[in-house]
Amino acid sequence: STVHGGVGARIACEVFGRSAGELLELATDDEIRSRSRAFLADTLAEISAVAAEADRPISDFATTFVGVVADESRVVTVQIGDGAAVAGLSDGLALIAKPMATEFVNVTRFLTDKDAEDRLVVEVFLQAANRICAFTDGLQPLIVDERTQEPHAPFFERVFSVLVGASEEPFDERASAWLSKMLSGDPVQKRTDDDTSIVVARRLP
């Protein structure tokens, strides 16, 4: 973690939230990748402004990033660094965002790195996704097979089942409370000492 990594992550999520819908309006993969690079530049500009105001180096705000946006025909992922995402596609569960490979163990890439644009990974899937789960690297060894890169179906089926009957509001208190209880339980906490953040979403009809 970094000194103000949480601030950097919040800024990245806010900028992505403002521009994510535009990705699905673009016709080609090249246009999507170009817009994703613009998202990176916009995020760095906002982080740089906050860092300058605080008189801190931008590296203090370093953060990894996994962003996913989907409609009835496509899924787009934008990623730099570790973390991953799984989606329920028309043909089953799929790992749609994979942790970035690095030369050394426990070393990752950050959105604030000088070569971040070169490290940015953008993927486009021509399928509908009705359920999406993004999570940090602390959960990955528990729910994704390291050798096959296959999602652990029982875990995701259980997690996605929480969305059944959830409200159509952006944030559902009941589902969030269930996830928090699950993540703080011994089956998870005894198997990882890293961050266990998770975001679960469904696409409304």
Each language-model region and where it sits:
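Short, structured patches in soluble enzyme cores that scaffold and shape functional sites
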Residues: G67-V69, Q79-G81, L89, K98, ...
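Short acidic, Gly/Ser-rich segments with clustered Asp/Glu that frequently serve as metal-coordination loops
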Residues: S1-G6, A84-V86, G138-E146
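Primarily the active-site beta-strand->alpha-helix module of PP2C/PPM metal-dependent phosphatases
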Residues: S1-D29
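C-terminal catalytic subdomain
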Residues: D115-E117, V121-P205
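Active-site glycine-rich loop that binds ribose-phosphate moieties when present
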Residues: F61-A62, T102-V124
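Catalytic core of PPM/PP2C metal-dependent serine/threonine phosphatase domains
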Residues: E25-V86, R119-L126, Q189-D193
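Flexible glycine-rich active-site/ligand-binding loops centered on an Asp-His dyad
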Residues: L93-V105
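Surface-exposed beta-loop interaction hotspot
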Residues: A87-G88, I96, R109-T112
